[in-house]
Curated annotation (Swiss-Prot):
Entry similarity comment: Belongs to the HAM1 NTPase family.
Annotated PANTHER family: INOSINE TRIPHOSPHATE PYROPHOSPHATASE, INOSINE TRIPHOSPHATE PYROPHOSPHATASE/HAM1 PROTEIN
Reactions catalysed according to its record: XTP + H2O = XMP + diphosphate + H(+); dITP + H2O = dIMP + diphosphate + H(+); ITP + H2O = IMP + diphosphate + H(+)
Subunit and interaction comment: Homodimer.
Active-site residues, record numbering mapped to chain: 65 (proton acceptor)
Cofactor(s) this protein requires: Mg(2+)
Protein name per the record: dITP/XTP pyrophosphatase
Length: 184
């Protein structure tokens, strides 16, 4: 089976590929841009994007909308994560948290799969924001996020390690389980 992943982010593709490879599913990147609406939740953003793409893309596809939610910043950047990453970057988040004791944060990932109907899969990982960036793996906010139970950032892990515990890994697991049940 081949699965089209609509995304502009090669880091996401790499993670989905590594996740699905052992299951005999090939993931390929489909670079079609779609509107990301301003909404309160990742689910709404993902659902709107998937329904918009459904009118324009042939065959099944999935997309992933993710965000980093920092407790001391009342959930910011959350649904604005892509914009914040492009503008102030992870250095900007570190600056906002300077001197802050509460470093708790979580990542959330929403996968929307369209096969004529919409299917939503989600995953979350709790952790904290590091005081300085570490590691060169991964992408995005990975150098400043330390998952609970670890003392390394996501950027200091291999893709396989990150997949085992990450928001996206968990959403991919739900997605893969659903495919197993529904493609018989
Ligand atoms: P799409 O084309 O798939 O939308 P994107 O990078 O814009 O790619 P999102 O809107 O979902 O993706 O991402 C929001 C931001 O959060 C973006 O800057 C990502 O780099 C970052 N991000 C998403 N998942 C991440 C992860 O697993 N680790 C670190 N940063 C992540
Ligand atoms: Na995006």
């Amino acid at each position: 089976m081949r699965l089209a992943f609509v995304t502009s982010n090669p880091g996401k593709v790499e993670e989905a590929r590594k996740y699905f490879e052992p299951l005999g599913v090939e993931v390929y990147q489909l670079k079609v841009s779609y509107p990301e609406i301003q909404a309160d939740t990742l689910e709404e953003v993902a659902e709107y994007g998937a329904k918009w793409l459904a009118q324009r893309v042939d065959g099944p596809f999935f997309l992933d909308d993710s965000g980093l939610f920092v407790e001391a910043l009342k959930g910011f950047p959350g649904v604005y994560s892509a914009y914040v990453y492009k503008t102030i970057g992870y250095q900007g988040i570190l600056k906002l948290l300077q001197g802050e004791k509460n470093r708790k944060a979580h990542f959330k990932s929403v996968i929307a799969y369209w096969d004529g109907e919409l299917h939503i899969f989600t995953g979350r990982v709790d952790g904290k924001i590091a005081t300085e960036p570490r590691g060169s793996g991964g992408f995005g906010f990975d150098p400043i996020f330390i998952p609970e139970g670890f003392d390394r950032t996501f950027a200091e892990m291999t893709t396989e390690e990150k997949n085992r515990i990450s928001h996206r890994g968990r959403a991919l697991r739900e997605f893969a389980n659903w495919l197993k049940e529904n493609l018989k």
